[in-house]
Amino acid sequence: MPTNLLLALVLAMTITPAYGAALPPCPASPNCVSSQAEDKHRIAPFVVKGDPAQAFSCLHTLLLKRSDTTVVAFDKSMIKVEIRTLLGFVDDGLFLLAPDMAVIHVRSAARLGYWDLGKNRRRTEEIRQQFTQACLSQ
């Protein structure tokens, strides 16, 4: 199999999780939150009301409008973002649509450092509030 084709397959599989796919686990450090974590990293998923695909598309639009956020990958079930902090650090965000559960799973983690002073949790809650106002009140 040609190397380019193999590389394309690997990339497609890593950036396009299936519905209900698992988020990567958080590291032991306190600089990550995940709606699929069972410990101190746990944060609630975004609840979807109405059409899940429409809500997910609305979340995508909301993320595109944020000045600190760059959408690096998007498909019908996954949004992957990079978020630049005021100090220039880059955090990674991942949103996975689980339409059968009427939720969007979320993970946000710092790329560097040990402790983020709760920034990923606060930012995720801020995005949740924006999502609720913009996407669920239609």
Language-model region placement:
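Ser/Thr-rich, low-complexity intrinsically disordered terminal regions
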Residues: 16-138
